[in-house]
Amino acid sequence: LNRHTYHAVPGTEAIAPSVPRLCTLRLKGIDRTIVLPDDPELVEALSSCIHGWPSDLQPLDPATLATPDPSALAPLCVIEPRGPGIYRTHSRYLDRPFDKLPAATAICTLLADLSQAYSETPGDHVFGLHCGAVTICGTTLVLAGARRAGKSTLVARLSAFPEVDILCDDVLPIAADGRAVALGLAPRLRLPLPEGASPAFRQHVTRWLGPADDRYGYLPTPNLLSHGKTVPAHVFLLLDRRDEGPARLHGLTEDETLCRLLERSIAGPAGPEPSFAAAHDLAKRLTGLRLVYSDLEEATTLLLRHFGRLGEDRQDFGPVSPPLAPTAPESPETPAEIDQTMPFVRASDAAVRRVGDAAFIWRPGDVMLWHLNPVARAIWAMLDEPAPATLLVEVLGELFPDETPERLASDLQGLMARLCAEGLIHPAG
């Protein structure tokens, strides 16, 4: 990050400032600023996670806080110091701030905002994908899978090899010609590492681990592609992690490739219809493959051998096994019922994240866990304060007089039980 010296107002050196010294960060292509503390450790940690994205860091004049410019756009994100190494973050995409965050989690919320803002801003892309992406000897793989399929861990493991370049582990912009665009944001790794992680993987993480806390850490390895670098996309790789069995590659039908790609699409700056058309065109260009695996090292070795042998000839990605039957969505386990008279409240580390007209329950570092329809969003809003299901049913009964109380109570019971099982709400007190 390009850093400029903070210039204090002459004659005020002995006066304790009413607010901490702050900076504004601007990144090329993003029309809103980021406000953060003038804290060298935080700035250095953030800088280590952003590779090649032109930026400008300037001191924020305290006078502008008292008399803000009414014509200026509100900041994209504000990181507020709350004590040594602790921060509160405010985002234009979230319905509430996150408080008491360590530096790595505060950086996580900021990078999520940057990814979303870039996806919405007109530029060199038409839509985005929630996915990981790497190149192996010049072949670009778009990696996606169900939650807990091991995407981020696989990207991190592959980052240890010199024949691999890293594009992303979360959001991948796609240009009109189908090329993948690197954002230059370091991949994030779930911590602690799995018990079965190999010594080589542990050594790699120890060497390159950047900002980290007890849940996640960033891995700014030298093979992270710079912001704006584009490469052709070749393969859509669906991750299918299982409890046992050897690593193997299967073909993926065109229909399932398209379906899985659309599931992970993020509407671009022109809106959903052009994004859908571009995603459809991309699916036609990509070869769809399924990676079935249970062991991370086996999967890594298989990918390196399979794609490393291709060289410049990428017309044939075989031999692979025949396609499997399309994977049915996993049926979630029925959660235990909750006491409908017990007050519940939202978890402090969860908030509503807005993406266009849609809303999701989101946690820093996690995927967007829950899509909220209007009714669920109203329930989530009411749980900002402790409330039992019995009270919520009464309110819903006024909003939906045609529904029976029994039906409303049953639906609400199921929703709150699932939210509780995920740790998104908990008993108050």
Where are these regions (language model features)?
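Long, basic/Gly/Ser/Thr-rich N-terminal segments
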Residues: 1-110, 114-117, 301, 305-317, ...
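Glycine-rich, often acidic-flanked micro-motifs
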Residues: 3-23, 38-46, 130-132, 136-146, ...
